[in-house]
Amino acid sequence: MRLVVGRIGRPHGVKGEVTVEVRTDSPEERFVVGKALETDPADVGPLTITAQRWHKDRLLVRFEEVPDRTAAEQLRGVFLVVDSAELPPLDDPDEFHDHELIGLRVETVDGEAVGEVVDVLHHAQDMLVVSGEKGSEVLVPFVRELVPDVDTAAGRVVIDPPPGLLELGR
């Protein structure tokens, strides 16, 4: 499975450097000089990192295949991806890679079927996007109080939603 580790933003300067919106907890491992990253759309890459640096909390990256600002502008919005097989296992049993959660069935603590995890959003609060009946979607804050059990081996997530949460998506 391919996982997004970054999204290319606008060019920085005239020599082909781009800003990268980092979408990984370990950018120091993902954005290493010499590493070739696959892309989405796939026909744009792979892109080989020749330089990277932090500037005002932004990651700036230069790719071998991008000689100037014009070429860099063409990459705006392209996703940088890695194969999930490259990821090391997590040490904390309460941490999960997004791809481990997507596709799990969701049920309440009472055993009522709710739907399936279709995405994980990383905003101020991590949210599970749960697709329910008739295509409805509900956002469930990914906190222990509301998600007391994640059993990837059994393929399920148990939620304890407050009154009204599940009705928001219907």
Swiss-Prot record:
Subcellular location: Cytoplasm
Ranges where the PRC barrel domain occurs: 93-165
Main subcellular location of this protein, as a coarse class: cytoplasm
SUPFAM superfamilies the record matches: PRC-barrel domain, Translation proteins
InterPro entries in the record: PRC_barrel-like_sf (IPR011033), PRC_RimM (IPR056792), RimM (IPR011961), RimM_N (IPR002676), RimM_N_sf (IPR036976), Transl_B-barrel_sf (IPR009000)
Family: Belongs to the RimM family.
Protein name in the entry: Ribosome maturation factor RimM
Organism: Thermobifida fusca (strain YX)
Gene: rimM
